[in-house]
Regions:
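Active-site neighborhood of phospho(di)ester-bond hydrolases with catalytic His/Asp-centered motifs
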Residues: 22-28, 46-51, 72-75, 99-104, ...
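Residue-level detector of beta-strand structural context in well-folded domains
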Residues: 61-62, 108, 135
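Conserved beta-strand segments of alpha/beta enzyme cores
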Residues: 44-46, 70, 117, 145-146
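Active-site-proximal segments of metal-dependent phosphoesterases and phosphodiesterases across multiple
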Residues: 57-95, 125-128
Length: 155
């Protein structure tokens, strides 16, 4: 059974909830997400199912607008993100998105590809390349103006 977040995700929410306008959860741990969001009923949350969210009713990808920025978000396993990012980039561009958020690799990533900015926050509970991470993005007037990969707070 995949269970990635345990208390790491809850620690991130505790630290960041007052500073964020919305949360985008990129899959693998939907049961943990539901529990972690209970104390924050006003937080706008968007989520997709990952390859370890067996039986989930959430979609595999989504599209949302934040401050004039069209955001395509997905776990990424259906777009082959462990092998290359071309399919993901094309899928985001086809939907008119300026930003594509993805997970699945458990590796933090940020890159501009043509008109699409690609961002992977890493993993709150099982980052493969170092400390567990999450991501913060600032969007203004249809553009990513700042991004950051942050280490998940310790206990």
């Amino acid at each position: 059974m995949c269970r990635w977040f345990d208390s790491g995700f809850e620690r991130v929410l505790l630290k960041e909830n007052a500073n964020i306008d919305a949360l985008v959860f990129l899959g693998d741990g939907l049961r943990d997400l539901e529990q972690a969001l209970t104390p924050y009923p006003r937080l706008r949350a968007y989520s997709v199912a990952g390859n370890c969210d067996y039986g989930a009713l959430e979609p595999m990808d989504g599209l949302a607008a934040f401050d004039q920025t069209i955001v395509f978000y997905t776990h990424g396993h259906m777009y082959g993100v462990k092998y290359d990012l071309d399919t993901l980039t094309d899928a985001a561009a086809a939907r008119g998105a300026e930003l594509a958020l993805f997970g699945h690799t458990h590796v933090p990533h940020a890159e501009q590809r043509g008109k699409v900015f690609l961002f992977n926050p890493g993993s709150c509970g099982r980052c493969y390349t170092g400390p567990d991470t999450y991501g913060l993005l600032t969007l203004e007037n249809g553009k990513v103006t700042a991004y950051e990969h942050k280490e998940v707070p310790k206990q």
